Design a protein with these regions (language model features):
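Intrinsically disordered, low-complexity, charge-rich terminal extensions
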Residues: 1-192
Length: 192
């Protein structure tokens, strides 16, 4: 019997969630600075993450920044919740993006791109040309942000498919989760 498209997508959600967890762990390990194609790209965990726990229907837990969400994130991950969505910021040179990455579907939501530069006051007032210029600049900004995440996902897939995943990467990820969970004050850990 042929599987439906939706059942195939649902069966593969784990990979995006593993990627998101690996990415957040890598940000912690490397201080958020990652070398990509000769540039230093800075990534940071934003002010909101959504975790999901299996079940029918699945239970969701949203952590919103009240200072530092990492300890509560660690406790939740240690208890088997899966990182489903995270707000991230990407900085490359002088440009900064903010977006929400959905790990289950590997989609981007609510991307905020860098501000467009000021217009040259001496330039002729050609609204159509200005609009087209702004549109092309905005499309290039989106392409750059997606390119960073594509590069990171490809790096994750190479590691995930290698022997290094079980030998080094997964144990390092588990150690990071344990360390985060130990940072939580006892009262917060009981509520996660």
């Amino acid at each position: 019997m042929k599987e439906s498209f939706l059942s195939v997508v649902e069966a593969k959600r784990f990979l995006g969630r593993e990627f998101l967890t690996w990415l957040v762990g890598r940000l912690e390990e490397e201080g958020g600075r990652i070398q990509i194609e000769g540039d230093v790209v800075e990534l940071a965990l934003g002010d909101r993450v959504v975790l999901e726990e299996g079940g029918d229907p699945p239970a969701r837990l949203t952590l919103v920044d009240e200072g530092d969400i990492r300890p509560e994130l660690g406790v939740s991950l240690r208890r088997g919740k899966l990182l489903d969505r995270a707000r991230l910021s990407i900085t490359r040179g002088e440009r900064r993006w903010e977006l929400t990455l959905d790990g289950g579907l590997l989609t981007y939501d609510s991307m905020r791109c860098p501000k467009l530069g000021e217009r040259d006051a001496s330039a002729p007032d050609d609204r159509r040309a200005a609009f087209e210029n702004d549109l092309f600049l905005r499309l290039a900004d989106i392409e750059d942000a997606v390119g960073v995440l594509d590069w990171l996902f490809a790096a994750f897939c190479r590691i995930r498919a290698s022997n290094d995943w079980g030998d080094t990467s997964l144990p390092n990820l588990r150690a990071w989760i344990d360390e985060l969970g130990r940072m939580a004050p006892p009262a917060r850990a009981a509520n996660a």
